[in-house]
Amino acid sequence: MRHQLNTKLACKEIKILVRSIDETKQMKVVLVAPEIPHNTGAIGRTCVALDLELILINPLGFDIDDANVARAGTRYWKYVNLSRYENWLDFIKSRKPKRKDMFFFEENGQNSFYKADYSKESYLVFGCESKGLPHEILE
């Protein structure tokens, strides 16, 4: 069973999650086909602050060298631990993540991300801003 988590949560839960990440460094944030450079830059900045790897899955809706990405990530973008894959299948073949380590964030997920059982090997997977995650990834 894949973890589909609800992203509509109170700030209190988000703060608790961030505090708990101290114990689980090296988690990975996966953005599947991100569309908005500012969002990716801001997520990259957060990854630097929390010592998380950022993984981008093509297609991207912008050039990764876009000034907007760097601007949103400000001076931190050069410190992002960044990996990129041509598509979801390449990512799966290369990383070989365990099913239990994959956490899929959806607007209408059934579970609170605060209650998930994260580990150092966890992959936090987010879809593109306008469409979310493709069904083939969630199946």
Describe each model-derived feature in a short phrase:
Residues 1-139:
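Post-transcriptional modification and biogenesis factors for structured RNAs
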